[in-house]
Amino acid sequence: SVQALAGFVTENGGQVDILVNNAGGQFPQAAENYSANGWRSIIDLNLNGTWNVTQALGQQMLKGHGGVICNIIMTIGRGNPGIAHSGAARAGVAELTRSLSYEWGPKVRINCLGPGAIITPGMEATYDDDVLSDIGETPIPQPGTPEDVANGVVFLVSPAGRFITGETLMVDGGVSRYGSNQALKGSDFGYRTTP
């Protein structure tokens, strides 16, 4: 459990300087078809999971010398057809981040990073070829890489980001400002379907 991890760190004379919350997930489905259990599972994973880890390790940071937290969410603010449950949870994480930046500053800086279309094996397995071919239709006409996300995280948690807190850095090639969800229209929202 998270409390056991926090206790282990303290008991062994350690302290947490940097926390990156990067657990998350969703299952694509039309919102009207979510079961109560399906909804709760995504909220628990994306929002409550982030909160549980943040609270346990944030308490240590507040008692100690402080620290930095980066919450990985997703590109939010434009709607994401087929994953409304995940969008709601991650918007909750963004608001939690803004609130904690006031409560926990100046000892703890906390920000979010919102990746856009990052080409990974999971992305290729999830989206159909039409959506994947449209990924490059952004002001930066290419998909992102895991290294792009890592570079954003390093910036936010390093001294280079020392005057940034309560913000969400979008690493998405500009799609959150200028892109389109047109490719996601239709009954399957552009997700691969299994027969």
Regions found by a protein language model. Name each.
Residues 5, 112, 132-164, 171-173, ...:
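C-terminal helical subdomain
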Residues 14-16, 61-74, 106-108, 167:
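Active-site loop of short-chain dehydrogenase/reductase
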Residues 30-31, 35-43, 134-135:
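Substrate-binding pocket helix/loop in short-chain dehydrogenase/reductase
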Residues 54-55, 98:
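A short, exposed helix-loop element centered on a Lys and neighboring polar residues
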Residues 59, 101-106, 162:
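Alpha-helical segment proximal to the catalytic Tyr-Lys
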Residues 70-92, 97-105, 117-118, 142, ...:
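Catalytic loop of short-chain dehydrogenase/reductase
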Residues 112-138, 148, 178-195:
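A glycine/serine/threonine-rich, flexible loop-to-helix segment
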